Each structure stands twice: as structure tokens, then as C-alpha cells.
Amino acid sequence: MQEFIHVKGAREHNLKNIDIKIPRDKLVVLTGLSGSGKSSLAFDTIYAEGQRRYVESLSSYARQFLGQMDKPDVDYIDGLSPAISIDQKTTSQNPRSTVGTVTEIYDYLRLLWANIGTPHCPKCGKEIHQQTIDQIIDRLMALEEKTRVQILTPVIRGKKGEHVKVFEDARKQGYVRVRVDGEVRDLAEEIKLKKTQKHNIEIVVDRVVIRPDARGRITDSVETATALSGGLVIADVIGGEPLSFSQNYACEDCGISIEELTPRMFSFNNPYGACPVCTGLGMQKRVDPERIIPNPKLSIRQGAIRASGWGNADPGTIAAMYYNALGKKHGFTLDTPIEGLSDAAMHELLYGTEEPLELSVSRVSGGVMRQPFEGIVTNLERRYKETSSDYARSEIEECMSEIPCPACHGRRLRPEVLAVTIGGLNIAEFSEKSVVKAMEFLQTLRLTEMQHKIGDRVIKEIKDRLGFLQSVGLEYLTLSRASGTLSGGESQRIRLATQIGSSLMGVLYILDEPSIGLHQRDNDKLLATLKRLRDLGNTLIVVEHDEDTMFAADHIVDIGPGAGRNGGEVVFAGTVDELLKSEKSITGQYLSGRRCIPVPDVRRKGNGKKLVVKGCAVNNLKHTDFTIPLGTFTCVTGVSGSGKSSFVNEILYKKLAAELNGAKTRAGAHDQMTGLSYLDKVIDIDQSPIGRTPRSNPATYTGVFNDIRDLFAKTADAKARGYGPSRFSFNVKGGRCEACAGDGLLKIEMHFLPDVYVPCDVCKGKRYNKETLEVRYKGKNIYEVLDMTVDEACEFFSNVPKIARRLETMREVGLGYVKLGQSSTTLSGGEAQRAKLATELSKRSTGKTIYILDEPTTGLHVADVHRLVDVLQKLVDAGNTVVVIEHNLDVIKTADYILDLGPEGGDGGGRLVVAGTPEEVAACENSYTGQYLKPVLERKNHVKSEE
């Protein structure tokens, strides 16, 4: 077998015809600036070719379903193994996907509960047993000799009616006695029952005395009884306790029976197991009063009610007629703040009236109409069910929130399935345990000898998979956690754990920043896992910026030296010791300490105002209080799963968005938030795409394209032709090429194969028609301007201050290499985030904005982090507040204030361990963040405290 993967002539995207040898069966890290070409080499070249070769080996019939894979732009690759890509872009948004289903642990749980679970009656909770005819007879024969027994078969259980036909059928079949509501009656008599009462009726099949020679007779009687009732038998022991038997899983008391247990009954994705009300989703969308009335301090006239069809209270509207009639009944006006309405008035406003209201009809002649009011919530829910309009549904969905299903209480399964237990827990209760707690439960589980024989192999598989999740630092996750709520790093590590479980060897694994979202404390577990995969005989290529991972690597490849057009070359390839001595590698300069992100000389104290959040209780937060000094750069830190996102994203951002931006968001559980009056808006700068269509690009997103179009419209040529700014837009008719509608590409549908995009043969991919492209500014047409990088455009428009200012902010945040017209869909998460930052920086600051960022260093090289920190500090220098969730110590050390959550993840977290400056956190012995921060701060000059 070859010792290297040899890549020759790689030219994908910005790669500059590179040749590289990557050692096999080693842990190899690819690093370099954002946009330098790391992913182009790892995913778009090496992985794409490995995958393509595998697909090529399949039959043409199979290939039509998998799709045709393009050959990467590379001369050849030698020594390639079957490739598995574990990236962050494949997090499932399917609401039916959970941690348990993704890891396949839930499949083993279904097998376990179906085979060794103990069923109970879902109504009374009594244990249900399934017995054969032989077991029933053995039990009866074990009674004391000469015991008299009536063998009964239940035919009616708790049903109203006279049941005349039941008695007639029993007479025809030759039976002489029945027991009605506990009293034995003769069928020769006329039996009259009250129609309105519930009754229990059992046919007396036989009366026997227990003797050794009676076994044959008892067998016949029991078989007859089970045939009549569908498997149920009651042995009424004279002078003793009655015995109930069932051939099926059925409760003799309640008459509820369940089918024989099978694994599919425990699946919430199967109609046999899924809760019939929520179809296994565990949640239901319902109209939420808090989203209809987000601000109860406003009156109806001021727009307190923000629901489709009910927001306009102008005279003459139907809404105003109902509001006035309700006001007349309850003594309020349209100018009364909603919080001033009585409980009765509020209830009728939302859920309607039983009695008719007197509605004043605004006609010329006037008049009064009497009609009940449906209520805003009831009206919206009815319209949501009845409408066929997608627009109307989306309008109403704005007023809806997801609530746990009232039938299964969020547990997704049918009641009879939830009544099956092992060790006192049903399958949903087990799934709600964290990985650690689930492992503890299985280790202390006591089973019978028979259960051990059946379940031991399954339990071993479950334990192994739980162990793999622990080994990648995910011990705080619950198996019931929806996949869509996981971060990119978490979902990637779950798939990594699944791969370890497969124990394959000779595979090429390509990973994209597996350390994202991991605290330094948990990073060691991840590195041990990667080494374990390597030691099995696999090759790992990891795209990574994390220092610890680089120091643990067998081989490092640094792609650069810059980004975009300035990248795409191999700057360095070798061991980490060699990298530290490299003069050319920026990575080596930062790793060796020759370059660094400086600790600020002064920590800001803030503007004296504070944002205080009390009693936070979302997920694992333990009614925790937080204080954020305004006018500071605040970092929220803590181990993975400690509650950072619960506080910042679920409570802080949603509350601020509702109060300051008027968003219809519902904040997570907390007691109160004070200090809102010191802020005027909140902006969440995440890594979501800045546009989801190829028409969106950095120029349109940042707004600089409007200024560029205005400039072109002011040229003499454009004025002579009568062209306005819209002429230079590729989104409207006029200036764009109509053959491709301004896309520059034509989509050709290939049915079984993926759609193919080819350049438009009319405009040759330039998006505009010939006449528009004839208009030039400083010798360049609009297409050529869009084809410039931000750096090139900065020089080109240097004498146009309005445009130059916007472009300069894009350059400041590190987007100098990005083309103005580059499709937003091709930007990485980090690039999209920096485009948002550039847009914010170019706006005039009010000094009262709070910016929220969740792990902004994702995908960023340390040199890019340096630039990002400078940008965030600029936002704070303008008087704003920046709150960042972060694990990167280079960012944490530059903060003014730190909120450190923990001390552990999951149940062991949710508390504030320490709050203060980085120096104060580093001095806290209980803080894991402090322990790792301390040596970082000690390497720098001591910080002067602000006077």
C-alpha cells in the first residue's frame, strides 16, 4: 500500500495548480486563512474524487439515483481510499430526527423495550402479563384440591346499554348462567338492564372442582372461554380471590388490550407507535396569546394586537366593531392599555363569548347587530385549518408557538407504548436522560435471568454507543434532543462517534473543524477520539484552526498565503515543530508567539448602566441571575452544555428582539429583565447565509450596489440614453439579459441526474444586455465592476467617499478578497458573518445598540480572529454593547467582562460560576475557563486597570 495520498495539479476554485503529498494513516491538519483554499483541497478535490470513484464503481442503475458527480479540476490523485466526509453543513432539520435516531441508539432501545419490557395498563398502571393456555391451566391446577371455581369469560366491560343481543346469543350457544355486575343470573329468566348505566357481563362457561382428574375438563373450559372473549378468562374462586388471566397483553380490570410488543411500536416515526394527536412530533403549533399581544402596555388603538386581520382598529372595520362591543360589556375603550383589561375581558377577547354581543353597524341608517364573538385565538386557529392560501397560513404562523402535545406531553408515543417499562422507566423517560445518566442507569439495571439472556447483547451495543458519545465530549446531550437544535460542531461530533462505532479501517475521513463549540477541557477527549480513529488504520484530514489540534497532528499543511486570489498555494507542509520555525507561514508565526492578538492595556468599565436578567430557567439554567455592564465587550463562556446558548439565544436575544425590535419572538423562562430603556435595538450577527439565492451578493447585501448603480446612472452616456439606476439592476427588466433573467446561468433539468447550470449563451454569463454593458465608468462596465474584488474596488472608487467608506469596512473585516458580485450562497459562514459586521460598521452608530454573536470565530484562522476582535472593539468604542458566546481564548482574553457558566455541562451546569474581568475569572479556582485563561494572560504584559 502507498504511504502517501499524492495530489497533482489541483485547480479547484482558487487552488493554483498545487502538488502535495499527504501521509496515509496519519492525523493531518489543513490550516490557513479563511478563504485560502483549505476546503477546496480537502472537500472539493480529495473527498469529491474519492466519492466519485466509489460511485463510478456502481452499476448505471444505482448511479441514476445517486446523481452524477463532477470530476474535480485536478490532474490525478494517487493512493486514495474510500472517503467519508464529516462536515457541519448536514445537520438534519427534520423534526423527527433526534440524537437517539441519528446515532442508532434509539433503534437498539426499541429492540430492548420490545423484547424485555414489562407492559402496564395505560389507564390504571397495573402490570399486564401474557399467558399461554398451559400456564393458565397450571395455575388453576395449583389451587388447593376440592377448591370450587367458576370459569367466566367477559363479553361486556363497562358499556352502557340493555345488551339484549348478548343474552340471546349466550342462550343460543347453550349457556345457562351469566354474571351481571357481580351477580350470577339464570339465562332462562328475562334479564332487564338500565340503558343509561355501565355494565359488566361475564358468561359462566363452567363450574368445576379442582381434582387431578379434572385437567381435561378445565382445559376445554378455558379454551372455550378464551375463544369467546378474545383471550380473557376469569377464574372466580369460591371463598377466595378471583384470578384473571389473559392470552394477550390486556388489563382484565379496564378491558384495555395491546398487541404483542414489536420494535415498530416504539418508533415515533411509525403509525403503529406514534402518538395519534401529534403524529410522533411531540409538539403542536398553537396560536400563542403572547405573540398576538407582544407588548401589553399598548392599547388596541396603539397597535397592541398584532394578529392577521385583527391589527386594524380603525372605525368601520369589523375588528373595531367587536372591540367596541367587548369594551362596552367590560368597561374599557380602545385607548385602554391591554394590561388594564380584566381577566374576564382578556379571556373573551382571546377565546370568544358565549352570549351574543351588541355590534354597532356603521351604516348610513346606523343599526345594531347581535352576534357572538369568536375570539382572536379561536378565529386564527379556525382560519389556519380552513385556508388553502400559503400566504394566509404564513401570516397566522407568525402568531403561533410550538407547545408540547397535550396527549403525549411531548413524548411522541402512544399511551400503551409509554406504559411499557424496564427498571421502572419507559422508553421516552430513558431517552430524556443525558448520555451520562443513561449509562449509569444501564450499569445499575437489575434484570431477571431470562431478561439477561435476551437483552445482554443489545445493552452492550447501547453502552458502546453511549461511550462513543462521551468520548467526543457530548455526555450532556439527551437522546431525545432534536437534531435541528444541535450546533454544527455537535452534529459533526455525533457523526464522528457513529463512525468510531463502525470500527472501519483503511478509510479516509475528512473533517471540518470538529473542535467548534468545544471548551478546552473537552478538546482532549476529541483529540483522543481522532487518534483512536487513526490508530484503527485510517487517514484523517482535518480542516482546523485550533492550536491544540495542530499540536496533536502528525502532519500540518498550511494553505495560503492570503485568501481568495491571494491564496491557493501550499505555504508549508511538515510537522508542527517545523511549522513553528517557518518564516513564510502566518500560522507558524502565531503558534510560535512571534505574532499574537494583544491583550488590551485597559479594560472598559462600561457606561455605568446595566442590563440585569433575573431567574433564568430555560433548559438546564437553575433560576440564575446575570448582569451585563452596558458599553462593554462581554464574553459568555463555559464548558459545552453549560447553558450559554440557553441564556444568550433563548432568553437575552429573544426578549430584546421582542421589546426593542418588535419581533414576534417569545423569550425563554425568566423572572424579569431590567435596563432595556438604555438600548434602542438588538442585532444578532450569526453565521447564517446573507442570501439564499444566487442573486444575492456582498454588494447587494451591504447596500454598496445601490450607490454603484446611482453612480453609473449619473454618467454622461447613461443620461444621454435616459438610463436610471434600475437599468443597472439584474433583478428587474430593462437592463438585464432576458434570456437568463439576469442570472448569467441557465438551468438544464436532467431528471435523474443533478441539474446542470451552463453560462447563458446570449450574455456569456455577464447578466446584462449589450446596451447596458456599453455604459462605462472610468473604462469599466457594470459587469466588470461586479467582477472586482473588494480590494480592487476600494482603489477603483477611492474618489467616491460614499462607496469607498462601505468598501473600506468590508476590507477591514477581512473580505478584501471576495468579489462584489460573488453569489452569497458560495460564502462560508464566517464570511457571511463578516459581511453582516461590515454592514453594521458602515451604519451611523447610535451608541445604544447591543450586538449578539454566537461563536463568531467559527471557521476563522487566528489572523482572521485578530481582525474580528479589532472590529468588535470598534463597535464597543462607538458606545455599543457586544455580547459574544465564545470558547476561543484569544477572544476571551480581550473581553472587558466575562460571564462563566457551569461548572459542568447538562444537569451539572446552568449556574454562574464567576463574573468579572478576565483577570478575576483566571483567579477563580472553580472555573474551568479560568484555569485555561490564566496561562494565556500570564504570557502577556500585566493589564493596567482603568482609572
Can you say where each PLM-predicted feature lies in the sequence?
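Conserved phosphate-binding elements of NTP-dependent enzyme cores
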Residues: 1-947
